[in-house]
From Swiss-Prot:
It is found in: Cell membrane. Its EC number is 2.5.1.141. Belongs to the UbiA prenyltransferase family. Protoheme IX farnesyltransferase subfamily. It catalyses: heme b + (2E,6E)-farnesyl diphosphate + H2O = Fe(II)-heme o + diphosphate. It comes from Pyrobaculum arsenaticum (strain DSM 13514 / JCM 11321 / PZ6). InterPro entries: Protohaem_IX_farnesylTrfase, UbiA_prenyltransferase, UbiA_prenylTrfase_CS, UbiA_sf. This is Protoheme IX farnesyltransferase. Gene3D superfamilies: UbiA prenyltransferase. Pathway: Porphyrin-containing compound metabolism; heme O biosynthesis; heme O from protoheme: step 1/1. It holds the Pfam family UbiA. Converts heme B (protoheme IX) to heme O by substitution of the vinyl group on carbon 2 of heme B porphyrin ring with a hydroxyethyl farnesyl side group. The keyword Membrane applies.
Amino acid sequence: MNPYLILLKPRVIWLLILASLAGYLYSARQPNIAQAFSLLLVAFLSTGGAAAFNHYWERDIDAAMRRTAKRPLPAGLVEPRNALAYSLVLSALGIALGFLLLGPLPGLFVFLGWFFYAVVYTVILKKRTWLNILGGGFAGNATFLGGYALGAGTVDLHAVLISFAIYLWIPSHIWALAYKYRDDYRRAGVPMLPTVVGEKAAVAIISLLNLASAAYIMTLYLAFGGGLLGGALVAAGVVATIATGAYALATKTDEAMWKMYKASSPVLTLFLLALIANA
């Protein structure tokens, strides 16, 4: 894969882009292709720009971790100054087009999504506290709310409650991954939940958070009267998450934690697809 494409973290940002599209299609009475395309373009540029900036800022961390040592910057495939310029150009384009093409309120959420990931999480919190992902997680809320604001022209409590399905899923997902690579994070000096609270406590917290996230997603879907097809999709992901989360909580083994991580990965995607299906 081209190193500049890798800098965009496509396996991460596609879910944020999907969240923005789901917010738009869920809220718009009469969605149109031009608006949807503009939203996708803006979401791609702003999230990709933030991801590329994260690569630039964390290049020393990436070099110290086995999991990330082959990324473009520590591997010498991209010069740091080029990565910085690339990230800033994409970010500026995404934010500017967010205001120009989508309007003031959606544009504000585009900016907030970028800010929470690139500045709050990456620059301010990542190396300082294990609570870093709780600050950065608001980027997930913002992407959904930006799409919702574009479709509805406003943001209401309904939208905020749905956006917190994303917020709850993010730390449970990231911490489960961090548990597997906890030695890497210790080596790099990055505080993450599994490296600061002890392994048994981390397993309990992550498992319970996964269970809470799955339960919240299912409750939201039922409370807002979702359809049968979408309900089947969401239920499949939720059941898998609850089953593996309960098993991880009971056994507290690395294998069980990894199974929970893999099982919980699709649940947010299924929820967002269900929102689109019910639009």
